[in-house]
From Swiss-Prot:
UniProt GO BP: actomyosin contractile ring organization; border follicle cell migration; cellularization; cytoskeleton-dependent cytokinesis; growth of a germarium-derived egg chamber; imaginal disc development; protein localization; regulation of cell cycle
Main location: cytoplasm
GO cellular component: cell division site; microtubule cytoskeleton; septin complex; septin ring; spindle
Protein name: Septin-2
Region (G3 motif): 102-105
């Protein structure tokens, strides 16, 4: 049996078709890829966005047929917080590392202007972590945990009147960062007629506001028909339940009410089966691929442009990564040299200013010293004059005292002679 191989030469426009004379064995590549993938396991990260009490945790338990044992969240949180939990699941011989990220407190605040920012920051942070791992010299993309969000389930409150402003703003901010599938939560609370009108209203508002939600791919012939049909059912009206009831000989998930029972996996009751089929069984790999090839690549492109990297130069000619790096390095060194020269000039200028300031201070101190010397000399002169005057007064006093003593003695002698 001959095998035809299409060979593409980049320098040629036409394809060359070669024939082999025998079996080589590269037709086993798909099997090798499957075995390698099964050995490494798979990663799938889901983000659930919606107001508190819409059944996000219950739906996750129902989708993956397990109990993630999440704790209820209060309605009184002052801000939105994101909590991510990672679980190891295994079905047959396929291992899945599942991360569920919940938006705790979303939509519970009076001022909801900043509710979406925490979500956007979290998604960007996961992209940044992956980018930093890619940029390492010694990187380990296979072993590092990929925390990029592959799908965002946006839970819509079943009001029946349309989307809230917060819903539109948040989905508009996220549609270029993550695959979004809107779902109508607790769909058993509104009638089927209202539900169809509600779905149409939601799609009309999304289109009017330019919100791009995830569309199931139709380029694969094996699933094109199914995906085309399922695209028309978005947003899915879902019901989740952790309770089981017995129908015949089977236990099925359901919600029981006084007026009847809603079977979760009954497609006439809700769209849960459609969501599970599209999300897990048919398009999970497409969501993972689109996250990497579209959303992450867009983030990576913007970040590299912010760093100064580009595929073309100023003349719109192709430029390699190394050339860009060398140009950035040269610019950085020139800028560094310029900064060093600027700092040196600033230092010299400050030294000169300080020297001038010190000289001026020295001059002032010298002037003060001279003044103090003059003042001191003047005080000394005055004191000397005072001392001399005092000495003269003292001598004059002594002379007068002597004169008085002599006069007194003479007077005493005169009186003695008369007697």
């Amino acid at each position: 049996m001959s095998v035809e191989v299409d060979f593409v030469d980049k320098k040629e426009v036409h394809l060359r078709t070669l024939k082999q004379s025998g079996h080589v064995g590269f037709d086993s590549l798909p099997d090798q890829l499957v075995n390698k993938s099964v050995q490494n396991g798979f990663v799938f990260n889901v983000m659930c966005i919606g107001e508190t009490g819409l059944g996000k945790s219950t739906l996750m338990d129902t989708l993956f047929n397990t109990s993630f044992e999440s704790t209820p969240s209060p309605h009184t949180l002052p801000s939105v917080k994101l909590k991510a939990h990672t679980y190891e699941l295994q079905e047959s011989n396929v291992r899945l590392k599942l991360t569920i990220c919940d938006t705790v407190g979303y939509g519970d605040q009076i001022n909801k202007d900043d509710s979406f920012k925490a979500v956007v920051d979290y998604i960007d942070a996961q992209f940044e972590n992956y980018l930093q791992e890619e940029l390492k010299i010694k990187r380990s993309l296979v072993t590092c945990h990929d925390s990029r969000i592959h799908i965002c389930l946006y839970f819509i409150c079943p009001t029946g009147h349309g989307l809230k402003s917060l819903d539109l703003v948040c989905m508009k901010k996220l549609d270029s960062k993550v695959n979004i599938i809107p779902v109508i939560a607790k769909a058993d609370t509104i009638s089927k007629v209202e539900l169809q009108r509600f779905k149409a209203k939601i799609i009309q508002e999304l289109n009017a506001n330019g919100v791009h939600i995830y569309q199931f791919p139709t380029d694969d012939e094996t699933v094109a028909e199914t995906n085309t049909s399922m695209n028309s059912h978005i947003p899915f009206a879902v019901v989740g339940s952790t309770e089981f009831i017995k129908v015949g000989n089977k236990l099925i998930r359901a919600r029981q009410y006084p007026w009847g029972t809603v079977q979760v996996e009954n497609e006439t009751h809700c769209d849960f089966v459609k969501l599970r089929e599209m999300l897990i069984r048919t398009n999970m790999e497409d969501m993972r691929e689109k996250t990497h090839t579209r959303h992450y690549e867009l983030y990576r492109q913007k970040r590299l442009e912010q760093m100064g990297f580009s595929d073309v130069d100023s003349d719109n000619k192709p430029i390699s990564f190394q050339q860009t790096f060398e140009a950035k390095r040269s610019n950085h060194l020139a800028e560094l040299q310029s900064k060093e020269e600027e700092v040196r000039q600033m230092f010299v200028q400050r030294v000169k200013e300080k020297e001038a300031e010190l000289k001026e201070s020295e001059k002032d101190l010298h002037a003060k010293f001279e003044k103090l010397k003059r003042d001191h000399a003047e005080e000394k002169r005055k004191l000397e004059e005072s001392r001399k005057a005092l000495e003269e007064d003292y001598l004059d006093f002594q002379r007068r005292k002597q004169q008085l003593a002599t006069a007194h003695h003479t007077l005493t002698l005169g009186k003695s002679k008369k007697k």
